[in-house]
């Protein structure tokens, strides 16, 4: 009788342990993500203000390609974005409106005190590319009240003190391109500013707004911003006047490097490039 009781007890324990094991396996299976489902990723992208409309549209498209990725954008002047990155702001991918700001983070230029004065090495090796090309344009408010037709005419009007021009600050790429145009025409920016014919914007969007609101007679902005704002472009600067307008992009060290590279690769696809080209960008790679 004792043997039978012991046998029943052993059988009960075996069944109990089996049931517990099955329950644990079911719980573990429920906790595991479905096969092929990628882990959620938040990707922080710092990009020039002139890319606001295009990258916002591309972000919606990218959801289909990478539904696990949440894109967070920080748009602003490239100079401001550079400063934020240098000060330790979280950033996975940087897209600048000029090479100057990207050079300041490029470790391959660490020995070049002019291009990388602080000797920083913050870019993932091999990730830097020239992504896009833009154009510097002369845009006017609706109706073109001042009758401005070209950069040649603008130079004369500035010299005469008979025009009011909006341009970017000196730490903003669009402002730096404008300074090159001044140099091309032999104009003294300091003298022009003192005479009251210039007003400044902290980024290209601010300059564009001044033109859109007819607060100025004209403004020097990118072709893409003029298109997005529905402004009339009366002239475009040649490379001889201000050089090429190249937008470099690179993955920043220490963040979500793999996901950032994947998004940068996507920006070079036909689907993404169609969005860029629709507003006036062209591929630079």
Functional labels for PLM-detected ranges:
Residues 88-89, 214:
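Active-site charged/polar residues at nucleotide-handling catalytic sites that mediate phosphoryl
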Residues 66-73:
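A generic structural motif
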Residues 1-10:
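Positively charged n-region of N-terminal signal peptides that target proteins for export
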Residues 105-127, 226-237:
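Ligand-binding "clamshell"
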Residues 21-60, 64, 79, 98-99, ...:
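Exported/periplasmic ABC-transporter solute-binding proteins
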């Amino acid at each position: 009788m004792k043997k039978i009781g012991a046998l029943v007890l052993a059988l009960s324990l075996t069944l109990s342990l089996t049931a517990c094991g099955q329950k644990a396996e079911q719980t573990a299976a429920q906790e595991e993500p479905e096969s092929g489902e990628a882990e959620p990723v938040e990707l922080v992208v710092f990009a020039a203000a002139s890319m606001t409309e295009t990258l916002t549209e591309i972000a919606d498209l990218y959801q289909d390609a990478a539904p696990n990725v949440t894109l967070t954008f920080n748009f602003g002047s490239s100079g401001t974005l550079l400063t934020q990155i240098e000060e330790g702001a979280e950033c996975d991918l940087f897209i600048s409106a000029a090479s100057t700001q990207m050079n300041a983070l490029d470790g391959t230029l660490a020995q070049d005190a002019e291009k990388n004065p602080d000797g920083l090495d913050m870019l993932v090796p091999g990730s830097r590319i020239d992504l896009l090309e833009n154009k510097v344009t002369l845009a006017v408010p609706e109706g073109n009240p001042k009758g401005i037709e070209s950069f040649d005419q603008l130079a004369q009007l500035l010299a005469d003190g008979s025009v009011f021009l909006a341009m970017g600050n000196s730490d903003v790429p669009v402002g730096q391109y404008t300074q090159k145009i001044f140099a091309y025409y032999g104009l003294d920016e300091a003298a022009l500013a003192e005479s009251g014919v210039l007003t400044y914007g902290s980024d290209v969007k601010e300059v564009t707004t001044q033109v859109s609101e007819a607060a100025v007679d004209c403004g020097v902005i990118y072709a893409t911003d003029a298109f997005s704002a529905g402004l009339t472009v009366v002239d475009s600067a040649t490379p001889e006047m201000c050089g090429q307008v190249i937008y470099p992009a690179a993955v920043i060290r220490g963040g979500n490097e793999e996901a950032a590279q994947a998004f940068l690769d996507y920006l070079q696809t036909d689907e993404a490039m169609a969005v860029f080209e629709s507003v006036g960008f062209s591929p630079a790679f």
